[in-house]
Amino acid sequence: MARIAGINIPDQKHTVIALTAIFGIGKTRSQAICAAAGIAENVKISELSEEQIETLRDEVAKYTVEGDLRREVTLSIKRLMDIGCYRGLRHRRGLPVRGQRTKTNARTRKGPRKPIKK
């Protein structure tokens, strides 16, 4: 298994699909990385040479991925909560942030129903 950005990339998948195993790289970015590295998208990871894998590593290193990206997202949410803006309050209360209705629905974000005590 090839190791890129601290992640074991699946060998038996095509390059474009295999790169999406890295957090922060979707299909479009994966295609851009393959094009920049000069590697065909339909080649499997196991068929790549060590030099080609090294060029993939260099291309992936240009983006914010994995731990750095997770940390960045967490810190931006924490910043919203610290400044006390509306979005931060919604995060703090565990409610939908982007204006969805909460009278009905939003069960995933709110958790299981709490029965009304009489």
Swiss-Prot record:
Listed GO CC annotations: cytosol; small ribosomal subunit
Entry keywords, A to Z: Ribonucleoprotein, Ribosomal protein, RNA-binding, rRNA-binding, tRNA-binding
GO biological process terms on file: translation
InterPro entries listed in its UniProt record: Rbsml_uS13_C, Ribosomal_uS13, Ribosomal_uS13-like_H2TH, Ribosomal_uS13_bac-type, Ribosomal_uS13_CS
A Pfam family matched in the record: Ribosomal_S13
Family of this protein: Belongs to the universal ribosomal protein uS13 family.
Oligomeric form and interacting partners: Part of the 30S ribosomal subunit. Forms a loose heterodimer with protein S19. Forms two bridges to the 50S subunit in the 70S ribosome.
Protein name: Small ribosomal subunit protein uS13
Gene this chain is encoded by: rpsM
